[in-house]
């Protein structure tokens, strides 16, 4: 495997998510991952895309004082069905309920991205929008899926990188990685602005 170009700056992934760590490893870059401690509650009247972007930036900015030499990557995902947000279900019962609502419908996954330069204070952001069209699913199918994949920590109770891919008819979006939680296409473009190239 070719050696990647030297990294001029240390990278920090502001996330405790194993899914995001696996995605970032795809780029072959050296990085550290630390989970930030922020309040992820939505503000009154806050739009879903604004929430995803704000939380991505807050995650990155929260770690800047402790990592003053780093480029810090923050990302957050919000799932929307109609006018309702689908959060991380947390329990089996809530996961089943979310997927019963998603059955036969389209869920939009909004993934916010922020890369913050702790040295200069400059941030670049992006937002990926992916529409996922779910198959018509009965309760037994959903129960079996939730038991097998345990998507309790995933927005919309859905793991596209796991068995969840069998729940959908199709998806419309620019970057399938964003569905997992980190839009790599936008990330590589933003990193180039900071002088970090994958190739």
Curated annotation (Swiss-Prot):
One Gene Ontology biological process: nucleotide metabolic process
InterPro entries referenced in this protein's UniProt entry, alphabetically: ITPase-like_fam, Maf-like
Keyword tags: Cytoplasm, Hydrolase, Nucleotide metabolism
Cell compartment(s), UniProt: Cytoplasm
Catalysed transformations (reactions): N(7)-methyl-GTP + H2O = N(7)-methyl-GMP + diphosphate + H(+)
Pfam families in the cross-refs: Maf (PF02545)
Species this chain originates from: Methylococcus capsulatus (strain ATCC 33009 / NCIMB 11132 / Bath)
Residues in the signal sequence: none
Enzymatic class: hydrolase
Enzyme Commission (EC) number: 3.6.1.-
Presence of the UniProt keyword Hydrolase in the record: yes
Protein name as annotated: 7-methyl-GTP pyrophosphatase
Function: Nucleoside triphosphate pyrophosphatase that hydrolyzes 7-methyl-GTP (m(7)GTP). May have a dual role in cell division arrest and in preventing the incorporation of modified nucleotides into cellular nucleic acids.
A molecular function (GO) term: nucleoside triphosphate diphosphatase activity
Active site: 76
Primary subcellular site in the record, as a coarse category: cytoplasm
């Amino acid at each position: 495997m070719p050696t990647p170009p030297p990294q001029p700056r240390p990278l920090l992934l502001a996330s405790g998510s194993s899914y995001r760590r696996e995605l970032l490893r795809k780029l072959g870059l050296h990085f550290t991952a630390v989970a930030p401690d922020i309040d992820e509650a939505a503000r009154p009247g806050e739009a879903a895309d604004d929430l995803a972007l704000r939380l991505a930036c807050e995650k990155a900015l929260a770690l800047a004082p402790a990592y003053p030499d780093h480029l810090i990557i923050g990302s957050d995902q919000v799932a929307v069905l109609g006018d309702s947000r689908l959060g991380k279900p947390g329990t089996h019962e809530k996961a089943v309920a979310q997927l019963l609502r998603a059955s036969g419908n389209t869920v939009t996954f909004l993934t916010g991205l922020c890369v913050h330069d702790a040295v200069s204070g400059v941030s670049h952001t992006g937002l990926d929008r992916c529409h996922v069209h779910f198959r018509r699913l009965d309760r037994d199918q959903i129960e079996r899926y939730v038991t097998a994949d345990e998507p309790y920590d995933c927005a919309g109770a859905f793991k596209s990188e796991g068995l969840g891919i069998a729940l959908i008819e199709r998806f419309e979006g620019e970057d399938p990685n964003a569905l997992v939680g980190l839009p790599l296409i936008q990330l590589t473009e933003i990193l180039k602005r900071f002088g970090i190239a994958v190739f």
